[in-house]
């Protein structure tokens, strides 16, 4: 049933073309509830439009480290040179109301779904403000913090259980309700798993199923906007590579 499904998106990074493609896919599936795992801005050329879409759709969203960078809450020393340049550019163009929205976002959202503690966080929920990466082969002690834990940050989609990695890149998997899982939906706006399609995931609460979904979008248009706004060309080139 569509009512039992939620979409989880992450790491949009001001890529309007990718975000629109993903939101259209979600809409076509009839899914109404969307969670966003942060990093709405950074890297790309449409920060205002992306923030406004997330805000106007009433997505339940947490804040990411690039959002913190634009807010001046995170030192640029912690970003690579391309990320720092994009943050400085974003600070110049972002509207005050969109800054206020980013500033209102929490570090963690906790939900109760079918009696399960479900965590939504940009990075490791152990210390969310440290922005520690979690990967398929490195999950730290994350399973101490919830039953289903959704994180972004690495831009690599995967589903991991306490026993090890279960799913990478794309596909569906039924979860065992007696086990704990770490789920990364991948990145909408800058995938880094070698696949240049936007990535997000769908969680079916009724069937206890996860699907990682890949969506094609107009990469050329996103690239051209980056170049036009004199952002580092590599930020556009990497979109074609999925890196």
UniProtKB/Swiss-Prot annotation:
GO cellular component term, pick one: cytoplasm
Entry GO MF terms: phosphatase activity
InterPro entries: Ap4A_hydrolase, Calcineurin-like_PHP_lpxH, Metallo-depent_PP-like, Pesterase_MJ0912
Domain of life where this protein originates: Archaea
Protein name: Uncharacterized protein MJ0912
């Amino acid at each position: 049933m569509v009512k039992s499904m939620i979409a989880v998106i992450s790491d949009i990074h001001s890529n309007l073309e990718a975000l629109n493609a993903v939101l259209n896919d979600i809409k076509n599936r009839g899914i109404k509830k969307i969670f966003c795992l942060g990093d709405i801005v950074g890297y790309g050329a449409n920060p205002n439009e992306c923030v406004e879409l997330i805000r106007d759709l009433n997505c339940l969203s947490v804040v990411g480290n690039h959002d913190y960078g634009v807010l001046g809450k995170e030192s640029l020393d912690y970003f690579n040179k391309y990320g720092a340049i994009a943050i400085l550019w974003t600070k110049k163009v972002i509207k005050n109301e969109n800054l206020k929205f980013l500033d209102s976002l929490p570090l963690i959202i906790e939900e109760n779904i079918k009696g399960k503690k479900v965590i939504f966080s940009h990075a490791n929920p152990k210390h969310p403000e440290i922005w520690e990466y979690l990967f398929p082969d490195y999950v730290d002690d994350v399973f101490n913090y919830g039953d289903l834990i959704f994180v972004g940050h690495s831009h690599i989609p995967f589903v991991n259980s306490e026993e090890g990695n279960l799913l990478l890149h794309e596909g569906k998997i039924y979860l065992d309700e007696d086990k704990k899982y770490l789920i990364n939906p991948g990145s909408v706006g800058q995938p880094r798993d070698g696949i240049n399609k936007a990535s997000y995931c769908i969680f079916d609460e009724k069937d206890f199923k996860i699907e990682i979904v890949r969506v094609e979008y107009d990469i050329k248009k996103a690239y051209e906007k980056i170049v036009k706004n004199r952002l580092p060309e590599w930020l556009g080139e990497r979109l074609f590579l999925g890196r």
